[in-house]
A protein has these predicted regions:
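Zinc-dependent deaminase
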Residues: 1-22, 36, 72-82, 92-163
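Small-residue (primarily alanine) positions within well-ordered alpha-helices
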Residues: 14, 18-21, 31, 41, ...
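Short loop/turn microsegments at loop-to-beta-strand junctions
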Residues: 27-29, 84
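Short beta-strand scaffold segments in enzyme catalytic cores
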Residues: 29-37
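Short beta->alpha transition motifs characteristic of CBS
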Residues: 40-47
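Histidine-centered active-site/metal-ligand motif
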Residues: 44, 56, 134
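A short, polar/charged loop-to-alpha-helix boundary motif
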Residues: 49-60
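Short metal-coordination and nucleic-acid-contact micro-motifs, chiefly zinc-binding Cys/His arrays
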Residues: 89
């Protein structure tokens, strides 16, 4: 990773987004995308709010980041997130991992593993698959406990509400 980033700082920013999702009854996943040392996109899961199964935090943030880069006159990359780092509280699923590869994101830093749907090393490893035309650098476990506890609290609350 060429730019030295403060991974804990940016993961705390992603955790703020995850808490917004939690407060709105969404699975608490938060994302920030960093380019040139600054946050250019931030998002949280909005699947329930938007009634859209693709409205994962990563997908929303990728669109925001591409729009931001285009607004800055970065026309030649056409949505490419080269030199961008994405901070996610939960290991991305197959859909989001595929989108990160297609967006040519450089670095993925995530909090806690998703043993049931993780596609960045846990269940699959889409982001580092040699058969694809792009691979991401991956750092896992940044503020993992905070991410894990937030997710556990969400599902405990959900189970209580169903009783």
């Amino acid at each position: 990773m060429p730019i030295e980033l403060n991974h804990e700082y940016f993961m705390r920013e992603a955790l703020k987004e995850a808490k917004k999702a939690f407060d709105k009854g969404e699975a608490p996943v938060g994302v920030v995308i960093v380019h040139g040392g600054k946050v250019i996109a931030r998002a949280f899961n909005q699947m329930e709010m938007l009634h859209d199964p693709t409205a994962h935090a990563e997908m929303i943030a990728i669109t925001q980041a591409a729009d931001y880069l285009k607004s800055q006159g970065d026309e030649k990359h056409r949505g490419s997130l080269e030199k961008a780092s994405i901070y996610v509280t939960l290991e991305p699923c197959p859909m989001c991992a595929g989108a990160l590869v297609m967006a040519h994101c450089e670095n993925l830093i995530y909090g806690t593993k998703d043993l049931k749907a993780g596609a960045c090393g846990s269940l699959y490893n889409i982001v580092q698959d040699d058969r694809l035309n792009h691979r991401l650098n991956v750092i896992e476990g940044v503020l993992a406990d905070e991410s894990k506890f937030l997710m556990q609290d969400f599902f405990k609350t959900l189970r209580k509400e169903k009783r």
